[in-house]
A protein has these predicted regions:
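N-terminal secretory signal peptides
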Residues: 19-79
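Short acidic, glycine-rich loop/turn motifs
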Residues: 50-52, 83-85, 128-130
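Internal interaction segment
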Residues: 22, 87-151
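Extended low-complexity, serine/threonine- and proline-enriched intrinsically disordered segments
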Residues: 78-90
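Short polybasic amphipathic segments
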Residues: 46, 80-82, 123-126
Length: 151
């Protein structure tokens, strides 16, 4: 047990997960596209697709665990997913799923960052070091996923 706690502390304090500043996207233009919502087994999912129809962001409610997964396509693993909103930003530990090609982070449904995403003025951004950030409009589908996980 002590080894597991020590490993977790070392990981959280490692340079790979250092709390470097998340870039400011206040003046960034949101990608043209639209959010859609779909009920899925065990929750709901909001997907942002660009104007070419390519999925760019996913917010998924896992109702059984009351968690929200934030994911974006990625060519490779990265230790951190950067989340930016008009009033908050945070680096989140990320996990890569090679089967789906998605890099994701998980938040509890009550995490205040989700409220910041839902209420962000105009846009949100999800970034990964070495890849362009995805700047998407902050539409109601974000709130729908968050609220569904809180019920």
């Amino acid at each position: 047990m002590r080894k597991m706690i020590l490993a977790a502390l070392l990981c959280a304090s490692s340079p790979a997960f250092a709390q470097t500043a998340v870039p400011d996207y206040s003046n960034a233009r949101a990608v043209d596209g639209r959010w859609t919502y779909a009920a899925i087994a065990g929750g709901g999912e909001a997907t942002f697709r660009n104007s070419a129809g390519q999925s760019q962001l996913f917010l998924t409610c896992v109702r059984a665990s009351r968690q929200v997964l934030i994911a974006r396509p990625s060519a490779a693993a990265a230790p951190v997913l950067q989340i930016w909103t008009s009033n908050a930003s945070r680096n989140l530990p990320a996990a890569f799923n090679p089967a789906t090609g998605r890099l994701s982070a998980t938040l509890t449904a009550m995490d205040p960052l989700l409220d910041s995403m839902a209420l962000s003025r105009g846009r949100i951004a999800v970034g990964v070091a070495g890849q362009p950030a995805i700047v998407a409009p902050a539409w109601g589908e974000i709130s729908r996923v968050v609220e569904e996980c809180r019920l």
